[in-house]
Amino acid sequence: MKISFVLLLTLFICSIGWSEARPTDIKCSASYQCFPVCKSRFGKTNGRCVNGLCDCF
């Protein structure tokens, strides 16, 4: 029971960062097009193209 709780807690803590994507209104066709957009708007180059729009995280 303790092991299950620890695993569940670890998964929860690790998943916190995954849900911090910031959608933008910039259209894209590939993720590399989002890198300069994310850098200029949020200061980070982490981004991806999702459904034709850039998501920065």
Swiss-Prot record:
Principal subcellular localisation of the protein: secreted
The answer, when asked if tRNA-binding is one of the entry's keywords, is: no
Q: Where in the cell is it found?
A: Secreted
Signal peptide positions on this chain? 1-21
The transmembrane residues are none
> For this UniProt entry, what's an example GO CC term?
extracellular region
Q: Which InterPro entries does the protein's record reference?
A: Scorpion_toxin-like_sf, Scorpion_toxinS_K_inh
Give a brief account of the tissues where this protein occurs: Expressed by the venom gland.
Does this UniProt record's set of keywords contain Nucleus?
no
Disulfide-bonded cysteine pairs: these are C28-C49, C34-C54, C38-C56
| Keywords of the record | Disulfide bond, Ion channel impairing toxin, Neurotoxin, Potassium channel impairing toxin, Secreted, Signal, Toxin, Voltage-gated potassium channel impairing toxin
- The residue stretches assigned to a coiled coil in this entry are none
GO MF terms held by the record? ion channel inhibitor activity; potassium channel regulator activity; toxin activity
What protein family does this chain belong to? Belongs to the short scorpion toxin superfamily. Potassium channel inhibitor family. Gamma-KTx 2 subfamily.
Question: Can you name this protein?
Answer: Potassium channel toxin gamma-KTx 2.2
Originating species: Olivierus martensii
